[in-house]
Amino acid sequence: MQNIGRSILSYLKRADKLLWLIMLTISIYSLLLLRTVPKDDGKSYFLIHLLAIGAGYAGTLFITFFDYRNLAKLWWLVGGFCLLLLVYTQINGLAIESSGGMNTRAWIEIPGGLTFQPSELVKIAFMLTFGKHLSILQEKDLLKNPLQIVLLGVHALIPVGWMVIIQKDMGSAVVFFFMFLVMSFGAGIQLRYFAVIFALMAVAIPYAWNSGIIANYQKDRLTTFLHPEEDPIGNGLQQLQGRISIGSGQLWGRGLGDAPRVQKGAVPVQESDYIFSVAGESLGFVGCILILLLLLLLMYHVLRIAHKSTDLLGSSICLGFFAIICIQTISNIGMCLLFLPVMGVTLPFFSAGGSSSACLYLGFGLVECVAMHRNDPEHVTLHSRVSPAF
């Protein structure tokens, strides 16, 4: 028992306690919101989310016992496994339509009658593989080499292209692209390369729009938010009803469990993509602001850990996680407030999607791993951190 006690004390001494406190607060708040969402055919979103959180924290604890540098050495195994998982999903996966209008094979069935979306795991894997790629280039002084920058782009293009062309998942593609931009910028990639990227996008997006790569139903989703009232029972339904729910909560909300629109299920997929509307109706403006403050505090603290990192790999992992939380928060809340189109992007740590939640907690584990192991004496060097963005 004494050895166990010492181990716990040693872990707590090294752990980033503020990061844990932020995450635990977010977990409790998300569970309180989902506790009020009615069951669907006997399926409790609260229970599913609780299981996802439990699995996520177990994964976090497991990951933090390893040095992230040693984990990154397995980048080829992680990347290869994720590619095989995506291929398997495309062959044997399940097609489930979400608020993003997707109806492609993006899920696989797992024991217990549950489903898992591999693209969520690939996001976390990308933090590790792309971070390792940047780290290798830095060690070889190749971060300014044009050919190596092209290969970095190819690395990012694999998940982005797969999401756009194969799975028709625009939301995930946007997340991967933003991760690529943030991690590359943090590594000090020269701005001229970003100019080239945006110039290529200016050509590629119109081509994808007109060539059929972006399907018609996706085009409808991407344009409906401009005038949702023109299709109030179709593509505009979720955003119109979501805005009504958020507004009906006013300042303090109707109360947890007492929000009539939540209980009626007025907003489709309110447990997942539209959990922000549940907070708006139940806890009002105050509840919505609390979500924003918690996520902003999380992002700020992750950036602090990135800044304190003793190597580019550690800071890149943190920036990848920051990018996921940032772009998904903007996309989801923007969608709920009719500022952005519906793309099926979940609100980090709050939405009931088991795949998204569990995998995001693994991302949290990697960030915590950086915080705990950045000063390990066998790895720290005086000049190891070269991250011009910081």
How should these model regions be labeled?
Residues I4-M23:
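N-terminal membrane topogenic signal
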Residues G236-G257:
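Extracytosolic (periplasmic/ER-lumenal) interhelical loops and adjacent juxtamembrane/interface segments
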